[in-house]
Structure formats: C-alpha cells, structure tokens
C-alpha cells in the first residue's frame, strides 16, 4: 500500500478481460443473451409492441434472495411473455445522496463486513452469471462507475444512468459505446432538457479516454429517457409520469430529431415520493395513459418497478430474507398481481 493525494492505494484490481476469462459465459449463454438483446431492442425500435418491465430489488444485497426472486419472475414470465418482456433488476452499485451508507454488492459483497472491491467484482459477476445460466435472464444494472461497466458488459441487456450521473460527460460518452439500450434518467432537479441532451450525447459518436485507452464509439441508437420524478427548489417531491408530462417529453423528442424516441417510467423514487405502495397505482395510471393516446403508447415502452420478496425495507443488519436494505420495495404477492394486471390491460 502507498499513499498519494490523500488516497491509500491498497492493491491493483484485475481488469475486466481477466475477470471475464476466469468467469466466462458458455456458448449457450451467449446465444440466450443475444436473443434477449434483440427482443428488447425490438421494443425500443418499434418492431415489437411488447411492454418492458425493468423490475427487481432497489439493490442486490445478497445472492440467495435475489436468485429466489428471479426464479419466481421466471415462472411468472411464462404467463405474460406474449405481452411483456421482463428484465430483472440486479443493481450492484448504489448511488448515495450524501455518499454515506451501503453502496451495493460491488463495494460490500457481505453487507455486514468491510468493503472488499475484489470480492465484490467476483460476486456481482457470479450473480449475473447465475441469473443467465439458471433462469435465462440477462438483466439490468446501473452504470454508477463507467470504468467498471466492462466487468458485466457481456451479461447486461439493459443499463441505466442515474439522476446524479446523467450530466456527467464520462457517463454520456461511455453510454454511446454500449451495445444494449441505455436509459438516461432525468436529473434530480427535473430539467428535461438536461435529460434530452444526455440522450443526444449517448446517440452520437465520440473519441475519448476509457480505462487507459483512446476509444471511438459509434453512438447508441437505443439510448432513451427514464422519468423518475424530481425534487423542486423547495425540496418537495414532484412527479413527472402524468399524461401531460408524457406529452411534453414527446414534444421534446420531436424537436430533437433523436432515433427511437422512447420513455421508461420509474414508478418509485420521486414519482412515488418514495411511498413504495404508490407504485401500483402509478403503473396502472401509465398503462391507462398509453391506452388513451396513440402517441403516448408509441413513446412509453415500459416501466421500472422496485420490488423484492418482502414489502418495505429494513436496516442493513436486520437480516430478513428478501427485504430491501435500501429503498422500500413491493413484496412478491403485490408484484405478481401487478404484473398480471398490467398484462391484462395492455
């Protein structure tokens, strides 16, 4: 270990290529991933009229309950696959408003232990591998750290750039080189222009430095908007999923001349005021708006929903199996009924 600029350099971590070689995909897993990618892209480019659900825990805290949740999703998917494409959330990096608290499995593969980034890299790859190998699900994760994306780049079918990251140039440029759909959230202050600009950047080609290399990207035509609500100047929650909000985003897309104009609506966060049970009403309201307006139906490709095995949330050290240790989530019974209700109304 050596110290520089008030940073203690503990050890050099393996590069993504080394980790992928040690924990590889089989040929059959690669084929499943490729087929999943195409089915998801087809929704965003309009060649499929299926509805996307990016759904799962706020944070992937332990492998066992996450995989139990995914096993239940797999059984449920069989009932709705003619209408819905399910993309499980396996969020292994968590942004924190103040920088404090549990930062996700990458940092702490054991939430009760000290951070261990090497074990975290292995743990998140093994978890995503298990979801694909055992259940046929390539999943979604948040790109909190652009330089870490390639540890999972061969496993993810959907990537989200969060509200705190969406204005960052490295996130935008990295998104332009990702081969799967990347959702750009509106920023915490709610400026839709910032969100649209981030999509423009992600859909454009760039040359920049990435992981010590000079790289060139072609642009990501599947980059799109995620509406998650925002905090106004007075610190109040403001939602942006309503009928008129969706029409406003549709107008912004028309003016921007972007490819594959699309919106995913996040039913939690500031859209729900972090009242997790509100996600049920919000999800149904958005489906209703789609059914009332052909432009909204064409624009809104799906929902992002936070759910887990148990309702609500708990402290990091409480150890209730399948209960969130970050934001509160819908429990399984409510989740199952909501997905069936959504499918029935599409």
Q: Residue locations for each model-derived region?
A:
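Acidic (Asp/Glu)-rich catalytic clusters
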Residues: 44-47, 74-81, 129-134, 217, ...
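Short acidic, Gly/Ser-rich segments with clustered Asp/Glu that frequently serve as metal-coordination loops
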Residues: 58-61, 260, 268-274
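Active-site-facing alpha/beta catalytic cores
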Residues: 2-3, 11, 70, 83-248, ...
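Internal helix-turn-beta structural module
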Residues: 308-346
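Conserved phosphate/anionic-ligand binding catalytic regions in large, soluble enzymes, centered on
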Residues: 52-65, 327
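N-terminal beta-rich core of secreted/periplasmic extracellular enzymes
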Residues: 27-43, 76-87, 93, 117, ...
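Conserved, mostly hydrophobic/aromatic
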Residues: 56, 265, 331
């Amino acid at each position: 270990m050596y110290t520089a600029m008030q940073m203690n350099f503990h050890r050099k971590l393996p590069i993504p290529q080394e980790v992928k070689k040690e924990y590889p995909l089989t040929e059959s897993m690669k084929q499943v991933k490729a087929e999943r990618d195409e089915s998801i892209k087809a929704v965003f480019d309009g060649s499929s009229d299926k509805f996307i659900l990016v759904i799962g825990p706020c944070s992937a805290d332990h492998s066992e309950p996450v995989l139990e949740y995914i096993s239940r999703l797999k059984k449920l998917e069989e009932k709705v696959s003619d209408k819905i494409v399910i993309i499980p959330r396996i969020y292994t990096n968590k942004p924190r408003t103040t920088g404090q608290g549990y930062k996700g499995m990458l940092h702490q593969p054991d939430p009760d232990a000290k951070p261990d980034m090497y074990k975290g890299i292995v743990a998140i790859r093994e978890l995503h591998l298990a979801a694909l190998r055992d259940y046929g699900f390539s999943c979604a994760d948040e790109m909190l750290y652009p330089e870490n994306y390639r540890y999972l780049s061969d496993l993810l079918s959907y990537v989200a750039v969060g509200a705190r990251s969406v204005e960052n140039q490295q996130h935008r440029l990295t998104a332009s080189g990702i081969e799967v759909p990347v959702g750009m959230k509106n920023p915490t202050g709610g400026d839709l222009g910032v969100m649209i600009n981030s999509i423009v950047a992600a859909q454009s080609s760039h040359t920049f430095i990435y992981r010590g290399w000079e790289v060139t990207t072609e642009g990501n035509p599947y980059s799109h908007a995620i509406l998650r609500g925002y905090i106004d100047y007075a610190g109040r929650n403001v939602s942006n999923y309503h009928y008129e909000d969706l029409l406003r985003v549709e107008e912004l897309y028309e003016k921007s001349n972007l490819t594959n104009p699309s919106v995913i609506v996040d039913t939690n966060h500031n859209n729900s005021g972090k009242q997790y049970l509100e996600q049920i009403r919000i999800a149904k309201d958005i489906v209703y708006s789609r059914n009332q307006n052909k432009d909204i139906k064409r624009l809104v490709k799906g929902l992002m929903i936070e759910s887990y095995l148990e309702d609500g949330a708990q402290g990091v050290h409480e150890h209730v199996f399948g209960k969130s240790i970050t934001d509160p989530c819908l429990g399984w019974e409510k989740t199952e009924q909501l997905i069936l209700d959504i499918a029935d109304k599409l």
